[in-house]
């Protein structure tokens, strides 16, 4: 049995040796030959004068040696839309469009333009000697697109771009004074074959960052030439250490409290205020808004009376933008004075153009800190349901000092409040803060405001001498029209005004004031 096993091992070893020999002598050469036939060695193409092989793949022909951005001085382009030149400034080493230096050029756009002009990797070299340029849209009479790349060392490269090849994958091209015909990738169609406007980033105003947008000094919105909203940043609140209701002041339509939440939505848009596309660029030597014909084409028949005008300022940099309907659903035309361009802008980018004034205004009428108030004068009448006067109120409070050192004196008694009565007065102060706007007067059908009866007046003199005067006019059983320093377009609940009058009287006379009580709780 052992002998048979040894014989089998010898036979198998011999067979393995024979098969191995056959593989190396017969099969291996055949497989190698077949592999060579399937994957023949590609010899690098013969280069013409001026050409270069792509160093990465070793086979793509470049029409001229690859040029990087750091080597470039300028790129001059002529195509069916006109001409433009992108050049490197000697002053700051940045790239600009010649004659349109104010036009924004993004880093991404510049990178694409630089690659298109500096890397001429060909799809193929069709022929080394073209006999008929007209067949490819490259004859002189065809007026082919053209670009000239100038390097900092003085070297220039000039390329003509002809027809699109049938497959759409590239364009016929030639190098100036060279007979060879090439095909360049169709990626050049988004950089070298477009109008200047396509390459200009449609920025509209100064771009704010996340640290500064909330510090925007001024914001003004006009509609049809009329001021609609005017808000400023109150720098006095900065680093004051005091608790404030808002760091913004509203100057128009009145001295109302700014709705900080909604206004923040506005300011946030300044971090990336740009359009969807640039449609017109003005030159450095002439502002577009000076050309009435051009402006009219984009809906700006009268720049001083534009449908919408947006202005904002941060420090010494200001931005002014006009908006007009574009005729394209969901878009405006916008003209930027800062960049001298007209862009197509999505309505969603600037939704506040269509807001009403109440969107910018907090429901809270009065919002000043008690530490900033000098005097409060309150007068008025409380009437019953029949309009009969039930009580007349006339109270004045002097406020001196701040915080725990504040001293409050009702003029009617001439005696400063004790600590407990100061605490009670602060309940009344909260009642002042809780008189809220309820809605628009224009929806109430009041035709003649001059005939409305004044039922209350609250005059607040601030430490800085400024005055806020609130007047309330009865026009229904439940509502009052309110004005702030003579301006008004809103109404409040009459019961809140009556509670304000009643609590002023109670505070002056040392009676308990509860901000949570309804006026009806006093009279029931």
Which residues does each PLM region occupy?
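Soluble, acidic/polar mature domains that operate outside membranes
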Residues: 2-524
């Amino acid at each position: 049995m052992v002998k048979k096993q040894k014989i089998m091992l010898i036979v198998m070893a011999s067979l393995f040796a024979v098969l191995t020999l056959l593989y190396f002598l017969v099969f291996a050469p055949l497989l190698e030959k077949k592999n060579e036939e399937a994957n023949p060695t590609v010899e690098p193409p013969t280069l013409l004068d001026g050409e270069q092989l792509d160093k990465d793949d070793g086979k793509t022909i470049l029409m001229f040696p690859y040029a990087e951005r750091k080597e470039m001085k300028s790129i001059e382009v002529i195509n069916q839309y006109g001409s433009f030149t992108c050049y490197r400034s000697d002053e700051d080493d940045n790239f600009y469009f010649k004659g349109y230096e104010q036009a924004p050029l993004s880093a991404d756009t510049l990178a694409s333009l630089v690659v298109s002009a500096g890397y001429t990797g060909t799809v193929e070299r069709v022929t080394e000697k073209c006999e008929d340029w007209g067949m490819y849209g490259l004859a002189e009479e065809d007026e082919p697109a053209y670009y000239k790349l100038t390097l900092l060392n003085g070297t220039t490269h000039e390329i003509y771009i002809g027809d699109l090849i049938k497959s759409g994958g590239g364009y016929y091209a030639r190098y100036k004074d060279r007979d060879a015909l090439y095909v360049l990738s169709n990626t050049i169609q988004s950089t070298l074959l477009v109008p200047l406007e396509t390459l200009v980033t449609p920025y509209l105003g100064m771009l704010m960052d996340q640290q500064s947008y909330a510090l925007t000094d001024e914001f003004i919105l006009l509609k049809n030439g009329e001021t609609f909203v005017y808000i400023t940043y109150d720098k006095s609140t900065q680093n004051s250490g005091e608790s404030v209701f808002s760091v913004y002041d509203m100057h128009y339509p009145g001295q109302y409290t700014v709705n900080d939440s909604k206004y923040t939505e506005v300011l946030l848009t300044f971090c990336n205020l740009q359009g969807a596309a640039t449609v017109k660029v003005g030159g450095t030597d002439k502002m577009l808004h000076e050309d009435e014909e051009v402006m009219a084409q984009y809906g700006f028949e009268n720049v001083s009376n534009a449908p919408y005008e947006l202005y904002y300022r941060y420090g010494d940099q200001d931005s002014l933008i006009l908006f007009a309907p574009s005729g394209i659903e969901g878009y405006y035309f916008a003209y930027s004075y800062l960049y001298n361009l007209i862009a197509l802008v999505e309505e969603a980018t600037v939704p506040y153009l269509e807001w009403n004034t109440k969107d910018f205004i907090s429901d809270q009428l009065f919002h000043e800190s008690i530490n900033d108030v000098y005097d409060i004068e309150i007068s008025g009448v409380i009437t019953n349901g029949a309009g009969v006067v039930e009580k007349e109120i006339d109270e004045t409070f002097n406020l001196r000092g701040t915080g725990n050192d504040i001293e409050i004196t009702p003029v009617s008694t001439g005696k400063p409040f004790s600590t407990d009565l100061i605490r009670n007065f602060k309940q009344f102060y909260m009642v002042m803060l809780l008189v809220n706007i309820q809605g628009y007067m224009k929806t109430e059908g009041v035709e003649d405001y001059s005939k409305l009866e004044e039922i209350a007046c609250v005059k607040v003199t601030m430490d800085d001498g400024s005055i806020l005067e609130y007047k309330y006019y009865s026009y229904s059983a439940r509502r009052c029209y309110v004005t702030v320093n003579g301006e008004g377009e809103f109404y409040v609940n009459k019961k809140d005004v009556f509670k304000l009058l009643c609590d002023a009287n109670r505070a002056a006379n040392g009676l308990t004031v509860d901000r949570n009580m309804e006026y009806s709780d006093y009279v029931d």
